Amino acid sequence: MKKLNVLLVCGSGASSGFMASNIRKAAAKRNLDINIKARGEAEIENYIDEIDALMVGPHLAYILDEIEDYIGEADVKVLLMKPSYYSTLDGDAALEDLLKEF
């Protein structure tokens, strides 16, 4: 599998930062090459050209249409993270969800 570049977003980047750290740990255990950044939702546009996937906090479901507009024709997979793993910061479950797309 090629190196994946992933952006996680939440409201301010704090909770997505913890989740990104846990996904990094889960990926390292599997020897997967994944570059994960966590940012606030206001920064999405700045990263569209650099990422393969965008993982969105479940509380931001209301901006999915806006995100699709940002992405346009870019080849970026958008995943709405599930509350079941987001609320517990379960990096293994989040990684599984991500890998299903690739």
How would you describe each model-predicted region?
Residues S21, K25, K29, D69, ...:
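Short, well-ordered alpha-helices that flank and scaffold nucleotide-derived cofactor binding pockets
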Residues L4-N5, V9-G13, R24, L64-Y86:
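P-loop/Walker A phosphate-binding loop and immediately adjacent motor/lid segment at beta-alpha junctions
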Residues I44-N46, T88:
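Generic structural signal for helix capping and beta-alpha/helix-loop junctions
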Residues E41, H59, P83-Y85:
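Short, ordered loop/turn segments at secondary-structure junctions
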Residues V56-D65:
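N-terminal glycine-rich "phosphate-gripper" loop used for MgATP/nucleotide binding
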Residues I48-A53:
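Short acidic/histidine-rich motifs immediately flanking catalytic phosphotransfer sites
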Residues K2-E41:
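Conserved active-site segments centered on acidic
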